[in-house]
Regions:
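Active-site neighborhoods and metal-handling regions in enzymes and metal-associated proteins
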Residues: 1-195
Length: 195
């Protein structure tokens, strides 16, 4: 396919140092170099999700709570453009945000891009204080436990408009009290933004 003006490109890449330490960076940019009004609005929401989650992260705080903070910011931002409604806290508790943010906030990083996950995500990212959720979206959070000094991790939120998922949730009337499906139809061709 040929990239066209008005489309977005999402680049998720990294490099490895001679000492074998990994990096990971994700950015989304417009093909023509200029975001349109809708793209700019979604980009600003994702940027705020990242900024607030990043600032929340410090030793002793759980990464799961950073994820939930980003999810709450997503709901508030999507409410501001008419795609969601209701109290953000309630929408996040029911998982309504996961229609747009269906993955975890990030992961640990070190000698591997997803550091030590070969041992098992539950062993690395969870402990006796934090169990993995079975809620859609939150179940894909790779790291939930309390952060410790020296942890290296990514903070890479995203918002996506996945037609198949939208159709499925709309048909099931899932989270109708939080999602404005009528307005959401105009975003079916949007794609997504992650940073």
């Amino acid at each position: 396919n040929t990239l066209e003006s008005g489309q977005l490109v999402l680049n998720d890449s990294g490099a490895e140092s001679p000492m074998h330490y990994a990096s990971d960076i994700t950015r989304t940019f417009p093909v023509n170099g200029k975001f349109n009004k809708r793209q700019k609005a979604i980009y600003h929401i994702v940027n705020e999700m990242q900024f607030e989650a990043f600032n929340y992260c410090e030793p002793g705080k759980s990464y799961k709570d950073a994820h939930l903070k980003a999810a709450s910011i997503a709901v508030e931002g999507l409410k501001s453009i008419g795609l969601m409604k209701g109290k953000a806290e309630d929408a996040v508790a029911t998982g309504a945000h996961a229609l747009f943010f269906p993955h975890g906030l990030g992961h640990m990083m070190g000698l591997d891009v997803h550091d030590m996950e070969g041992l098992g995500e539950d062993l690395v990212g969870y402990d006796d204080k934090k169990d993995r959720s079975d809620q859609f979206g939150l179940a894909y959070l790779r790291l939930a436990k309390e952060l410790e000094p020296g942890f290296v991790l990514t903070v890479e939120p995203g918002l996506y408009f996945i037609p198949h998922l939208i159709d499925q949730w709309k048909a099931d009337k899932k989270n109708n009290n939080f999602i404005n499906y009528d307005k959401l139809d105009s975003y079916r061709d949007f794609g997504g933004i992650r940073i």
